[in-house]
Design a protein with these regions (language model features):
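Signature of extracytoplasmic/envelope-associated structural regions
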Residues: 2-396
Length: 396
């Protein structure tokens, strides 16, 4: 006899009954016409409306409580993720990043003892400090990621880490460098929290906010487990009621792999050189200090304050040079810090803090295995012209 499922008229709500949707706005001040939403891959979080009150000064007779007067409304969307391409996209938005994409395929690339010979167009497209990927050399070990150290002669690019071998031009080689550098390009989003609610006509209750601008963003690389992200957007407007937007549709959620600290984090770099197996973990944070501007009969508007780009790391203290980071901190030495992550297949992301002051680096000399806990704060690199960059070989 076939099993017949039990009918349940009113089961308890689960976290799986809620989805967070988002759509990047074409124009400030308006939700896109017939918006196409993407599901936010999240661990927790959603849209929040907080109505603030202040106590009235009017005296109420009879020893009753004083009235509460509405003093403001805060609209936010905060969520936590396990790192994916989507996480990287939100981090780029938190940087107000300027976006430049470059790809070239040619047979005139050559591998040198300290870098590459490249076509004139590639030479012009890349700058010192840029990250790029090459693929297609006959010696497959040459393929991979590199930082530009310097340029010379119109066709020669020196790299911070030399290729493993030299190879003359001839193979069809592809170079990719999609640059996302902190700048002044705003990214406003619409967010919608949609939750099962059988009391509504559509069986779904939706809270939609828009003109939402990033306020904070972070990525955390642990020693093991999943890389995670955390983001907060400040919204200026909301949709009245709890129904869907006219014509809205939802695309399938992205399916790229969550980045693992074990096999998804590929490398750490300090000053463009490998720090893999020295750096154990790393956190990076973006804070934009969005300040709310209130006005009577009008919703709150937000404007960026002074941004802070900070991070921390835990490092092994090896006997041949256990106090490198302590010396950075004591000497005020500026360093660049970066990590490289894989999203599965050939798709990778590199996050770079170009010029950092090491604000603290304390070795735990009482431990059986000594490590150094370090903190750093980014500042403008006057040579490169930016503070934080995200490089990808895939299209954001």
């Amino acid at each position: 006899m076939a099993l017949t499922p039990t009918a349940v008229a009113n089961s308890a709500l689960s976290k799986r009954d809620t989805v967070l949707l988002t759509s990047l706005q074409t124009n400030y001040g308006a939700i896109n016409t017939s918006p196409v939403f993407e599901t936010v891959r999240r661990v927790s979080g959603g849209t929040i409306k907080k109505v603030n009150y202040t106590q009235s000064g009017e005296i109420v007779a009879g020893y009753n409580p004083q009235n509460q007067v509405q003093s403001g409304i805060d609209l936010t969307c905060a969520f936590e993720t396990e790192a994916s391409k989507q996480t990287i996209k939100y981090l780029i938005e938190a940087l107000y990043a300027e976006d430049t994409s470059y790809t070239n395929t040619a047979s005139t690339f050559a591998s040198l003892v300290n870098g590459f010979t490249v076509p004139a167009a590639t030479y012009a497209a890349l700058s010192a400090g840029d990250g790029f990927w090459v693929n297609g050399f006959a010696n497959t070990l040459i393929s991979g990621f590199y930082f530009v150290a310097s340029k010379s002669g119109g066709t020669t690019i020196a790299t911070t880490i030399a290729p493993v071998a030299t190879e003359a031009a001839g193979a069809s080689v592809t170079i990719k460098s999609n640059k996302h550098l902190n700048s002044n390009d705003p990214y406003y989003r619409t967010f919608q929290t949609a939750t099962t609610d059988l009391s509504t006509v559509s069986d779904v209750s939706r809270h939609t906010v828009y003109d939402a601008i990033p306020n904070t963003g972070s990525v955390s690389i642990p020693e093991e487990g999943a890389v995670t992200g955390s983001f907060e957007y400040m919204a200026e407007r909301e949709v009245s009621g709890y129904e869907a937007i006219a014509g809205q549709t939802v695309t399938a959620a992205p399916t790229d792999l969550v980045v693992s600290a074990v096999d998804g984090v590929k490398a750490f770099y300090v000053n463009g050189l490998s720090a893999t197996c020295i750096m154990k973990s790393m956190d990076v944070s973006i804070s934009l200090a969005q300040a709310g501007d209130n006005a009577a009969a009008c919703g709150k508007r937000y404007s960026r304050g002074t941004p802070e780009f900070t991070g921390s790391a835990v490092l092994r203290a090896l006997r041949d040079a256990p106090f490198t980071w302590r010396n950075y901190a004591h000497g005020g030495t500026r360093v660049s810090v970066a990590c490289r992550m894989s999203h599965g297949g050939a798709d990778e992301t590199v996050i770079v803090f170009t010029r950092c002051v090491v604000t603290e680096a304390t070795p735990d000399l009482d431990a059986d295995i000594v490590t150094t806990s370090a903190s750093f704060s980014a500042e403008l690199d006057p040579t490169l012209g930016y503070s934080v960059g995200v490089f990808t070989n895939w299209t954001v």
